Amino acid sequence: MPIQIEQTWYKHPLSMNLYGLNFTKENIKETGICYLFESEKSVLQMEGFDMLNCGVAVCGSNFNKYQLNILMRECAPKEIIICFDKEEQGNEDKYFNKLYNIGKKYSNYCKFSFIYDREGLISLKDSPADKGEEIFKTLLNKRVEVH
């Protein structure tokens, strides 16, 4: 959404950015892992966890080549873990395929995996980080690898 400061309008294309990368870049380099969230809130929630914050947000529900290039150039993660919000019930196959296809599309660049809640640990539209560190780690340990 554009913002006006004095007589000048500024706009920021969200698809050309990764929220939080400026703060988490060194952690991603150190661990080789990047958690890819939809919203900025999830990146901020990770700050309260007893683990390194390796999260960035795409500020939406899509991940594109431009954002991947930013990640690879700035910190070259060995694995990108897609941690998108849980989507509508009844469309589980569609949601699973969406996450899988994002990872598959870019799997030549690094390892991809994604969090897929099979056990109902998070509610509809929740981020994997919304229920706290313990649930996040449980989901993380059961993530789906993209081959």
Q: Residues of each region from the PLM?
A:
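TOPRIM fold recognition
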Residues: 48-147
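Phosphate-handling DNA/RNA-contact segment within nucleic-acid enzymes
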Residues: 1-75
